[in-house]
Amino acid sequence: MGDNVSEDRVDVITAAYSLVGKVGYFWGGKSTVIGEDPSWGSVEKVSADGSRSSGTLRAYGLDCSGFVTWAVINGYKDQGMQAAVGDGTSDQWEKAGVVSEADAQPGDLVFQRGPEAGSNNHVGILCGKTDSGDWIAVHCSSSKNGVTVGEAYSASFRYIRKPSFYQDTTAEEN
């Protein structure tokens, strides 16, 4: 991750990594539980609108923004962080500021689309770089049916935002 990454960022990334391969994708899936949520894996009806899976029965898990919220809550060990990180991709976008790729750090959020996408977006967390300098992201992917790690650009992430709750000063403010 690098030597200049704050402890808060490392804790959020560590929490995010703890779910890789363990939690399935569930449209509208959220959790503010500190630790593993006992409801993960139980069969639930997808009640959120806007997906082909809406109305179907699936193993409960997280969607992309729910994963980001859970990782932040668990990184800080504070359920109150839900308000700071936001609910849903559009809220998470709004609660984060612009940061250039050169100034981005592990722990910053990445989005596939800009603000015009509203809630029709996808979000992940930057977690490091490849040997060739490309960003790596951890995210909860519907196409991979769960939490996965991979090259950010290959996963169509194009926008980087610094969450306002980080106390470092490398991001340009909106």
Model-derived features: positions:
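Surface-exposed beta-strand edges and their flanking turn/coil or helix-capping segments
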Residues: 40, 127, 150-154, 172-174
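A broad, low-specificity signal marking well-ordered, structured residues that form hydrophobic/aromatic
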Residues: 13, 20, 135-138, 158
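Residues that form or immediately flank small-molecule/cofactor binding pockets and catalytic motifs
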Residues: 30, 142, 165
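Low-complexity, intrinsically disordered short peptide segments enriched in small/polar/basic residues
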Residues: 9-10, 17, 96, 144-146, ...
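Low-complexity, Gly/Ser/Thr/Pro-rich intrinsically disordered linker/tail segments
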Residues: 154-174
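N-terminal capping segments
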Residues: 1-65, 69, 74, 173
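Intrinsically disordered regions, especially transient/low-confidence alpha-helical propensity segments
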Residues: 24, 37, 67, 90, ...
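...with weaker cross-activation on analogous glycine-rich loops/strands in unrelated enzymes
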Residues: 69, 74-149
